[in-house]
Amino acid sequence: MKNNCFKPGQVWLDTNGAPIQAHGGSVLFINGTYYWYGENKEKTVGDGKYWTYGIKCYSSTDLYNWQDLGFIIPPSEDEKSPLYPQNMIDRPHIVYNEKTKKFVCWIKIMYLEGIQAVTILTADKITGPYTVIKEKFRPLNMDAGDFDLVIAPDKKGYYYFEKVHTELICATLTDDYTDVTGEYTSHFPLEGPPFVREAPAYFTKDGKHYLITSGTTGYYPNPSEIAVASHYHGPFTVLGNPHVGDETDTSFHSQISSVFKVQGKKNLYIACGDRWLPNLMHVPYKAVRDMFKGWFTGDMAKGEQIVKEYNLPKYEATCSATYVWLPIVFENDKPKIYWHNSWKIEDFE
C-alpha cells in the first residue's frame, strides 16, 4: 500500500513494509531523487548492547514512499573500529564536494572509553562504499557533539556543532570539507544541560540563516529554539520556540535533526524530527529538565528520584522510535511549526 501523505509520529514503513531506519538523519536531492540516510536503530532494544547498527539509506521521488537501499556505512565487527556498534554513533551528515568529486560524511562518535570525537569518511557515490579517512578527530581541539554541515552557494563549507555542554560553535571547513580552517565563532553560551543548545539544524531563506536547536536532555524531548543571522557566522538572534501550541514543551514529542527545502516548491521547508521515545511520552518535560539539571549540577539524588518516580529505563529502546516530519511556515519572517495529524506536500506552495 503506497503512502500519499505524511503522518507524523506514526510508524513509517518502507516499500518493503519494514519500518524505516534512518534516525538522526538528513535528506539530499540528487539528479531527481531524494536520498534519506540516518542511524539504524533496529537492534537498540534497551539491553545496552547496541547504540547504532550502521548507517542506512533510502530513496524516493515523492517523499512519501521510500525504497531501502541498505547500508551505506555498515557496522564493523572490529572493536577498534569507530563503526563498532557499541560505540555511540550519532547523526551522520553527508555533503558533496564538487572540487574533489567526493561525498564527505561526518559522524559524531562517543567511544566505549569515553572519548567524544568525529569520524570522517568519503565515497564516490551517495550510496558508498565509504572509506574512513579520519577518526577520533577533535575539531579545534574541542569535544564535538551534535552538528550540521552546510555548503554555501560559493561552495564554502561550515560546521555547526555543540562544544559539549557549553556552547554552539560555527567553524569554517577546508576546501575539501574534511577539516576545519581554524576560523570559528561561538554562540549561545549557557550554564550547562539541560539548557545548552545541541542538534543544530540549519536552513536558509531570503538571505537569512536559521538554526533550530534542541536542549540537552538525551533522547528525552525538550523545547526547541530558533535563531536567525545575516551571516553563517552570526551573530544570531534568538526568535524563541518555533513549535506553536506545544503545551508539553517537548517540540511535539520530537527532536529535529535536519531541515530541507522541497524541490519545485516556492517556500516549503520540512523539519525532520525523531520521536525517540514514543513509549515514554507520559514523562513531563519538567521532570526531564529537573533530572538532567540534577545530574549535571551534582544533585544525583534528585535525578535518581525522578528515574524511580517514572520508572525510567537504564538504556532507552530507540528501536521503536518514529519520525515527526512537519512543514515550516513563515509568519512575518518568523519560522513556525504547527502540528498536523497528517499533511500533504500538495497543500503548500
For each feature predicted by the language model, list its residue ranges:
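Carbohydrate-active catalytic/glycan-binding domains of CAZyme proteins
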Residues: 1-349
